[in-house]
């Protein structure tokens, strides 16, 4: 039997998909801008 692939971890989640990571790159800021434009209540993990 293989194990489940999703092993939740808040720290890993924030490091990979967090707000500060998004702000670091131009592409990341574009993602945030798109999500703001769409009206998302949550912008990032």
Swiss-Prot record:
Signal peptide: none annotated. One of its GO terms (biological process) is translation. Keywords: Ribonucleoprotein, Ribosomal protein. InterPro entries: Ribosomal_bL34, Ribosomal_bL34_CS. One of its GO terms (cellular component) is ribosome. It comes from the Bacteria. Gene3D superfamilies: 1.10.287.3980. The keyword ATP-binding does not apply. GO terms for molecular function: structural constituent of ribosome. Belongs to the bacterial ribosomal protein bL34 family. This is Large ribosomal subunit protein bL34. It comes from Arthrobacter sp. (strain FB24). The lineage of its organism: Bacteria, Bacillati, Actinomycetota, Actinomycetes, Micrococcales.
